Amino acid sequence: ILDLREFPDDPYGNRVVHDIQTILDDPEVGYVAECMGGVNPAYQFVRSCLEAGKSVATSNKQLVAEKGDILLQVAKEHHVNFFFEASVGGAIPIIRPLHTCLAANDISEVAGILNGTTNFILEKMFCDKMKFADALALAQKLGYAERDPSADVDGEDACRKICILSSLVFEKHVYPECVYTKGIRDISLEDVQLAQSFGCAVKLIGAVKRLEDGKILPTVMPMLVPFESSLLSHVNGVFNAVMVWGDGIDKTMFYGRGAGKLPTASAVLGDIIDEIKQTDTVLSQTWACLLYTSPSP
């Protein structure tokens, strides 16, 4: 366990190390879970682990959104795996289903509620008639929002997640700076009430669709979502939901808790367990392809 802190009273306190090299040099370490957040030093640590022949599972959405293409290539070159199911949707299984259950589909669009904090705030504004500042303060009090909520309320978190989904579905790496992003900071109680009068909820939607000319359009913005025609309008609280449109399935929705330590841990451990089950194969996961291949000697 790499950490700068000491945990003398923890039953695993003797496993804590302070130098990544200790992990890299240990031949008994075959699988690494990265949950640091941010790009640096996580990128250097993850890349070093992959180059040392250790598979990595991460929950770090910023790392995957900005460096996922490079890390997937490094993993492929060293015949190990780089998994990131926990980077989008917490406990919602969406990364792997896009490449397994839905692999036969020509996917045309992905859209969803990808940030539980903003969804909670908008619900409180809608149901309890709270102003934005009051709803945000409540989210912070309950631990749903950080002291600095910018990444959530300005749409950065949802942007990183739609980048990952876009890259997986449409065969190219989509960087956050290429996505039009508008958060909910300027949404007023009057806006929410006006939407309600039209039979709609206001939701922060991350979406990507293929256009007629073959280009793709990724966006993150508040949208009016009709109650009568969209399941997303009924997704409340800190829950997330992702809808996928394909030529074979028409549309399907993945729903569940999108954040929190236990949902995130569930997804990270699920990746590690899947890796352990595939001890005789290398699961080569890249943007827009996922193949089982024989491992190199």
Residue ranges and their predicted role:
Residues I1-E51:
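N-terminal glycine-/serine-/threonine-rich beta1-alpha1-beta2 phosphate-ribose binding loop
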Residues V17, A33-E34, A57-S59, F82-A86, ...:
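General beta-strand structural signal in soluble alpha/beta enzymes
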Residues L50-E66:
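ADP-ribose/adenylate-binding Rossmann-like module
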Residues K61-F82:
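Rossmann-fold NAD(P)-binding glycine/threonine-rich loop
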Residues F83-A145, E156-D157:
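Rossmann-like NAD(P)H-binding beta-loop-alpha module
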Residues D134-H234, F239-A241, G260:
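Substrate-binding/catalytic subdomain of NAD(P)-dependent oxidoreductase enzymes
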Residues S229-L291:
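ATP-dependent carboxylate/acyl-activation modules
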Residues Y292-P297:
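Conserved small/polar residues in nucleotide/adenosyl-binding loops
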